[in-house]
Amino acid sequence: MSDYKDTLNLPKTSFSMKGNLANKEPMILNKWEKQGIYKKIREHFAGREKFVLHDGPPYANGSIHVGHAVNKILKDIIIKSKTLSGYDAPFTPTWDCHGLPIELQVEKKHGKAGQSISEDDFRKECRKYAKKQVEIQKKDFKRLGVLGDWEQPYLTMNFDYEANMIRTLAKIIENGHLSKGFKPVHWCTDCGSALAEAEVEYADKVSPAIDVKFKIKDKDKLAQAFGLDSLNHDAFAIIWTTTPWTLPANQAIAVNNQLNYSLIKIEDFYIILAENLVEQTLKRYAIENAQIIATTTGNKLTGIIAEHPFYSRHVPILHGDHVTDDSGTGLVHTAPTHGVDDFTLGKEHNLSMEIFVKGNGCYSENTKLFAGEFIFKASDRIIELLGEKKRLMNSDKIKHSYPHCWRHKTPLMFRATPQWFISMEKQGLRDKALQTIKETSWAPSWGQARIEGMVKDRPDWCISRQRTWGVPLPLFIHKETEELHPNTIEILHKVAEKIEKDGIEAWFNADDCEFITETAQYKSVKDTLDVWFDSGSSSMCILDLDKRLSYPADLYLEGSDQHRGWFQTSLLVAMSAKGSQPYKEVFTHGFVVDEHGRKMSKSLGNVTSPQDIYNTLGADILRLWTASTDYKSEMAVSDQILKRTADTYRRLRNTARFLLSNLDGFNPVTDIIEFDKLVKLDQWAIAKTKEFQDKIIEAYDKYQTHTVAQLIHHFCSIEMGSFYLDIIKDRQYTAKTDGHPRKSAQTAIYHIVHALVRWMAPILSFTADEIWDATPKTTDLPIQLCEWYTGLKSFDQDAELDLEYWAKIQEIRSEVNRVLEIKRNEDVIKASLEAEITIYADKYNYKLLEKLGNELRFLLISSKADLKVIEESTSSSIAANILGLLIEITKIEEPKCERCWHRSSTVGDNPQYKDICSRCVENITTEAGESREFA
């Protein structure tokens, strides 16, 4: 037996079988850095139509988690796909750098501002800390393969950004949207500050639920209201509350004019309840022998005076539209400084707005009996006092949804304080925002209804904060009238100029006289701006001012929690400052959870860190998992899920390697064969690739990365791996090196690789770079500067062997493979080349298959394939799952060719080559080698 190894075209490529991504990726990153690849992209696509995806700023605090990674990877995939489509698609990363979380970190090391450390030094430390955190996160984002202008990111603490926030505020004031108000706002006692809606989250809390007796002062008036002559016992209005700590601030009781109220006698006193709540309330009190004396309407009760349960204070009964008879007692305790409805009622009736609770959550010195006590701890003492004074009708516990601080996870309180607001009603901001939402594209589509509901119901936006590390609210108000200085806009622009030069410190360290002359009449506001105003201003501070970008953004892409956060604040700032929408399209992705659908938590031990993933499996595995997951809902990740992703990656890599290894020696300048002259199967491969490319580009355009990933995987494993590449192995390895059959296959492979590497590039950025380096090409451009491949062709409309034809051939081949597997299991054959395949076909299928002539065997990867009419079928033939088709498999008895391994009666016909078939002899000895037309 001779050794024919040197006569075969064995596969050869520099593209390795093993990814070894964790080690290779940093080297590829280093190469990109040296090439200045992002700068080259910008230069190459300069002047093209722009596509701007505006980056929502992550908070500069701590290492990135897998949610951050998902967000940046999705953005990177979209940007890279848009670049492939020929857009100038810049990506400028941003960071949120002010606010409480950074203050808390600095406090741990240096103590509170103004106590252990000066406020000026505290801000310097905050700036230093934020800068360090940005560098940590930047390194991680770059390691994920995310391309962007990392050297010039936008930080909300950049001096120019801080200054432009002040200029944005000036526009908002100029447009009439700012208002000052003494209003109840969500207040965190740990933050010592008001919170915006976006900083409030709801969680279950167990609270005391008590029914309190307010004694009616004028019994005769009450009797008259119920149509009675008189009352011979004390009467009480009963309120139900879950916030006993607000009782010191009670100033009124609210009823509804339209509701019916009952007077009920219990032993030696009367109580007042809403008629529809009598039965369930008495049941709650476990009282059975009560007697309903009379019923009246709420409007008859208004004006009657009650007495505070433990203070010498008169409490009027007033009408409130917010009062219902759905729960409680139908009479509502009213503390104007601790609730929105209470406040509205208090303003309407000029009730006392005395503040009883300080910013730290303790009662102020003017709170009799409870001064200095923490409000939530004082509830038990208040309940005890009510019992002593016989004013407690009932006491219970209730588990209910309650507002908590998003940062501290502690319960909030409503607290009326002087604050600055962007008004939702002045200048019709709410209606304008709602109209703009309708004009914006939202995906998933439910995002529109979600943000509409939030904007429709949201209160005025409280933009003032009582913090140290934040952009100032640099206003001057009159010391007596509290009106804004008449030159406010001019002053703000002066402040912005100083901040642009020296940062926010320029305001905090300045004297008032540097900005105004009337310091005797006006004082400066010491508040800072809500950090959501920082990020919400980004469209004004970045998109509207940076000529490299454009306003509005084409796309915002963030987690689904941003309907109440950045999407909303961006909209409100842009609408109030510029009067137009900041974005054309808004996409959201779901949260990352574990394989059981649980949130990531250190306590559960289910945290998957991006650092662990890219240091072990590689960033491309994380990128592939991100792209493969339908990100419109929750995204499950675990070690097991990532292992499956790594398996998928291996299949994709092996396909790329097989393709590249069969391009050894191929010169695209001299060896390309025209489409019409290719072997028919190679024509199919190119046309099929074109069909997939059209679908893939469409999916990329719709940001459907999971569809892209599915299509690429299907293409590699089914169309290529299970069909085309399986069939052409024989031709590639055994045909004459420079003969037409092999060059035809190499031409198809060349086109396929050039398309496939581009499909992969947005997702598998590192691997695509590696593939590109190993690919024969006619350009020196790096893959990042390429556009979608245009060398693919489709079949003409009148093509006889078109995609539909080959789809039917694939079906038939699958059925043949099924029967081959049956015969393998029966030990009739060990491999398909040992099989003699006979297909019995009806007229329709016969016509399909006869077109392939004697090359049918190459498609079926067998040594012999016969086609016969169905009437000649034998009892040993097996019915296919295709109508009009039977298949018979027998073992071929011909000798094996030692070169191509086909069984052939021609083995030994040539005395010089006794152990190979005549086809192999032709490929070794003749100038042209064998010819192929179909496969």
From Swiss-Prot:
Signal peptide: none annotated. It is found in: Cytoplasm. It catalyses: tRNA(Ile) + L-isoleucine + ATP = L-isoleucyl-tRNA(Ile) + AMP + diphosphate. L-isoleucyl-5'-AMP binds at E558. One of its GO terms (cellular component) is cytosol. Keywords: Aminoacyl-tRNA synthetase, ATP-binding, Cytoplasm, Ligase, Metal-binding, Nucleotide-binding, Protein biosynthesis, Zinc. Binds 1 zinc ion per subunit. Zn(2+) binds at C897, C900, C917, C920. GO terms for biological process: isoleucyl-tRNA aminoacylation. The keyword Zinc-finger does not apply. InterPro entries: aa-tRNA-synth_I_CS, aa-tRNA-synth_Ia, Anticodon_Ile_BEm, Ile-tRNA-ligase, Ile-tRNA-ligase_type1, Ile-tRNA_ligase, M/V/L/I-tRNA-synth_anticd-bd, Rossmann-like_a/b/a_fold. Its cofactor is Zn(2+). Belongs to the class-I aminoacyl-tRNA synthetase family. IleS type 1 subfamily. Monomer. Catalyzes the attachment of isoleucine to tRNA(Ile). As IleRS can inadvertently accommodate and process structurally similar amino acids such as valine, to avoid such errors it has two additional distinct tRNA(Ile)-dependent editing activities. One activity is designated as 'pretransfer' editing and involves the hydrolysis of activated Val-AMP. The other activity is designated 'posttransfer' editing and involves deacylation of mischarged Val-tRNA(Ile). This is Isoleucine--tRNA ligase.
